[in-house]
Amino acid sequence: MAHKKGQGSTQNNRDSAGRRLGVKRFGSQFVRAGNIIVRQRGTKVHPGDNVGLGKDHTIYALIDGVVKFQQKDKNRKKVSVIPAS
């Protein structure tokens, strides 16, 4: 017979660190080529002019310029980089 009570184990006591997603450069901000503009899961924001789309749906600048967010249609946003002149 046990003289001490057995220790119960916990199962739901874990949490993962946040993934640091979101907008990294906002509208009217200057960016250099290669700067990350948005980190996202899926295409919440769609790529416009002078931006690239990474395999993890990261949107990044292809040229130096100014970030511009636009409403593509009712449900879609797009982000472009306007060349700095």
Curated annotation (Swiss-Prot):
<keyword id="KW-0689">Ribosomal protein</keyword>
<dbReference type="Pfam" id="PF01016">
    <property type="entry name" value="Ribosomal_L27"/>
</dbReference>
<feature type="region of interest" description="Disordered">
    <location>
        <begin position="1"/>
        <end position="23"/>
    </location>
</feature>
<comment type="similarity">
    <text>Belongs to the bacterial ribosomal protein bL27 family.</text>
</comment>
<keyword id="KW-0687">Ribonucleoprotein</keyword>
<dbReference type="InterPro" id="IPR018261">
    <property type="entry name" value="Ribosomal_bL27_CS"/>
</dbReference>
<dbReference type="GO" id="GO:0006412">
    <property type="term" value="P:translation"/>
</dbReference>
<dbReference type="GO" id="GO:0003735">
    <property type="term" value="F:structural constituent of ribosome"/>
</dbReference>
<protein>
    <recommendedName>
        <fullName>Large ribosomal subunit protein bL27</fullName>
    </recommendedName>
</protein>
<dbReference type="GO" id="GO:0022625">
    <property type="term" value="C:cytosolic large ribosomal subunit"/>
</dbReference>
<dbReference type="InterPro" id="IPR001684">
    <property type="entry name" value="Ribosomal_bL27"/>
</dbReference>
